[in-house]
């Protein structure tokens, strides 16, 4: 497992199997997960100062991650 905080398996531990299944059968869900991971890693790089970003950009990334997480949660609960 990654050391990056907020990975989907950590955020939704009860849905790990369902996430795996949906990634294989639902292209939209797979794209949302890929985008979530990309944004989450960008936030982690900003937090760890590996990449310098403005406070506004980091805030925008956090809002984007939350929106993606909400969409993923909705699909997991469906």
What is each PLM-predicted segment?
Residues 1-78:
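Extended, charge-rich alpha-helical interface modules
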């Amino acid at each position: 497992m990654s050391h990056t905080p907020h990975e989907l398996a950590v955020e939704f531990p009860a849905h790990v199997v369902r996430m795996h299944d949906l990634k294989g059968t639902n292209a939209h869900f797979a794209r949302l997960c890929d985008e979530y991971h990309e944004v989450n890693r960008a936030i982690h790089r900003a937090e760890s100062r590996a990449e310098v970003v403005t406070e506004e950009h980091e805030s925008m990334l956090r809002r984007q991650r939350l929106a993606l997480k909400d969409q993923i949660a909705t699909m997991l609960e469906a």
